[in-house]
């Protein structure tokens, strides 16, 4: 029997996958897919890895432990730091020099060198559902207008851009590895919008389908102009982003701006027709329903899948011709 997965996440360079389960946590190497580390514990609701280091951010599943974040050196098997929060930890992300922690109402930013609290972002008392971090910026949905995304500086704790993404609540947001784009999907799940982080302009709209289905994971290709998404029905759609922003190295500006791209989009039927693109390739996860994470591999034309059902899959993607993606590998996560 596969273990019941509670959390899964690839590290920043996509080389390792960390898994939290009812019985502890594991770390797997992506290529070739092999188990590197396993630890029996009282369950892990969050398990994040810092690049290829032995440092993991870890949260237990027991009710009394969900407010406690531990930084663990898994090689030496010691707890380096413990931080208590006023409410349960909802998400944790690493950058090369920052630790970012989300709880209800707040985002905490720490300096990784000394674990000094640098900034706290107030997200009000609403629920932050969509949350992503890239280098010096964090993206999260507006609790008051959940179809909007804020981009905020980790160094100043100031929102620099407000982007109108969807008419319904944003459910998933992801940064391009270079940070110049974000992709968003709403609870409806029929389209994914790709938007520049510098000025919030709409780059393209990618249509998953016309029947609503929850999109649970989005991933940009690290080099090529492709994006993949996985929905709750187990279908992976791969899109080619043929329209690229003019300045891929740009960053959000230092003052708050409100994107007008969404209003332009609504008032331009012509733009809606040519800017909506169908999938380039597809894959079918062999499960009746799916919840988990997908990611483009950094070591080849592959999509990797970690399912909360306790399974790992790897699909081949033909980046030249598209079409159906062949299932190359299947693995069951061990307890």
UniProtKB/Swiss-Prot annotation:
Signal peptide range: none
Compartment(s) where it occurs, according to its Swiss-Prot or TrEMBL record: Cytoplasm; Golgi apparatus, Golgi stack membrane; Vacuole membrane; Preautophagosomal structure membrane
One of the GO BP terms on file: pexophagy
Recorded topology in the membrane: Peripheral membrane protein
Disrupted-gene phenotype: Impairs atg8-processing.
Extent of the WD repeats: 165-205, 210-249
Keyword match DNA repair: no
A Pfam family reported for this protein in Swiss-Prot or TrEMBL: PROPPIN
GO cellular component, one term: phagophore assembly site membrane
Example GO molecular function: phosphatidylinositol-3-phosphate binding
Keyword annotations of the record: Autophagy, Cytoplasm, Golgi apparatus, Membrane, Protein transport, Repeat, Sporulation, Transport, Vacuole, WD repeat
Residue ranges the record marks as coiled coil: none
Job description of the protein: Required for cytoplasm to vacuole transport (Cvt) vesicles formation and autophagy. Has a role in sporulation.
Family, per entry: Belongs to the WD repeat PROPPIN family.
Name the UniProt record assigns to this protein: Autophagy-related protein 21
Species annotation: Schizosaccharomyces pombe (strain 972 / ATCC 24843) (Fission yeast)
């Amino acid at each position: 029997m596969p273990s019941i997965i509670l959390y899964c996440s690839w590290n920043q360079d996509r080389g390792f996958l960390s898994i939290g389960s009812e019985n502890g946590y594991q770390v797997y190497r992506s290529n070739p897919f092999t188990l590197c580390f396993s630890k029996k514990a009282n369950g892990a609701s969050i398990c994040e890895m810092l690049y290829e280091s032995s440092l993991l951010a870890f949260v237990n599943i027991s009710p009394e432990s969900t407010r406690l974040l531990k930084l663990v050196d898994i090689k030496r098997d010691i707890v380096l730091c413990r931080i208590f929060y006023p409410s349960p930890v909802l998400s944790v992300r690493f950058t090369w020099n920052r630790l970012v922690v989300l709880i209800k109402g707040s985002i905490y930013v720490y300096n990784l060198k000394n674990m000094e609290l640098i900034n706290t972002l107030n997200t009000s008392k609403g629920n932050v559902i969509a949350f992503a971090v890239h280098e010096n910026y964090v993206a999260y949905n507006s609790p008051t207008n959940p179809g909007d995304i804020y981009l905020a500086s980790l160094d100043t704790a100031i929102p620099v851009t407000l982007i109108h993404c969807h008419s319904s609540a944003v459910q998933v947001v992801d940064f391009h590895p270079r940070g110049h784009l974000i992709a968003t999907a709403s609870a409806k799940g029929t389209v994914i919008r790709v938007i520049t982080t510098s000025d919030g302009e709409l780059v393209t709209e990618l249509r998953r389908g016309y029947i609503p289905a929850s999109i649970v994971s989005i991933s940009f290709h690290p080099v090529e102009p492709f994006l993949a998404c996985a929905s709750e029905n187990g279908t992976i759609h791969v899109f080619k982003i043929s329209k690229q922003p003019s300045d891929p190295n740009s960053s959000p500006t230092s003052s708050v701006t409100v994107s007008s791209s969404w209003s332009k989009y609504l008032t331009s039927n012509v733009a809606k027709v040519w800017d909506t693109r169908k999938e380039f390739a597809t894959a079918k996860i062999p499960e009746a329903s799916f919840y988990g994470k997908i990611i483009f591999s950094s070591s080849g034309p592959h999509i990797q899948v970690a399912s909360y059902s306790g399974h790992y899959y790897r699909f081949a993607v033909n980046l030249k011709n598209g079409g159906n993606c062949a299932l190359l590998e299947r693995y069951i996560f061990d307890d």
